[in-house]
A protein has these predicted regions:
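...captures the hydrophobic TM-helix bundle architecture rather than a specific catalytic motif
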Residues: 1-205
Length: 205
């Protein structure tokens, strides 16, 4: 049992009664993720609403999506939630090499997701002529999926920076707050994709 008022290794403080007070970094990340959840919720509602107005105008969702490609890319992203969790646990166990391995795999899976998204867009634009200005479907689809891809890209960049810092031993088991908040962000990005995938590729078709 830790003494009251002692700082923990996660960037919080154990206050009297053992309540955890989050660090400013964690509070900031939670606030950011809350605002991003509202942002994506608005985009998803806009996609569903406008899609109902434009389903008869070609090209439309029932024609253009290639589910095998989308499923493969999605599997990579969903798997990355597991690998980043394992990486964080490895760092807490002071297993730096295991952390680097699992964290690096998470980056690769994120890149594979982006590759799959790029190939899907190539198909939509090249074969079907679907662009963000083509019709309401194109506008709402590329806005929603594009912003998600942007968030994945940002996540991959930040994780790559963390990987470099960890290799140079600037991130260790005694300093896991940065890794933890990046993990929160990545789990959020994965969670958003579950909802986006459901509405765009399942319900929307």
């Amino acid at each position: 049992m830790a003494p009251a008022g002692r700082s923990d290794s996660d960037g919080g403080t154990l206050s009297p009664g053992h309540l955890v007070t989050l660090s400013p970094v964690k509070v900031g990340m939670l606030t950011f993720l809350g605002s991003e959840a509202a942002f994506f919720g608005t985009l998803i509602m806009a996609y569903v609403y406008f899609l109902r107005q434009t389903t008869q105008e070609e090209p439309n969702p029932s024609q253009v999506f290639r589910l095998p490609m989308i499923l493969a890319a999605s599997a990579c992203l969903f798997s990355s939630s597991a690998t980043i969790h394992v990486a964080e646990k490895a760092l807490r166990r002071k297993s730096q090499e295991a952390f680097l391995g699992w964290w690096g795999l998470t980056i690769v899976l994120g890149l594979l997701f982006l590759l799959g998204t790029g190939l899907e867009w190539k198909n939509l634009i090249g074969r079907w002529g679907l662009t963000i200005s083509r019709n309401l479907f194109g506008t709402t689809y590329f806005t929603l999926v594009g912003f998600h891809a942007l968030h994945v890209t940002i996540g991959v960049i930040v994780m790559s920076i963390v990987f470099g810092l960890a290799r140079s031993r600037q991130i260790t088991a005694g300093n896991v707050t940065g890794v933890e908040v990046v993990s929160w962000y990545w789990h959020f990005v994965d969670g958003v994709w579950v909802v986006v995938f459901t509405f765009v590729y399942v319900v929307g078709r």
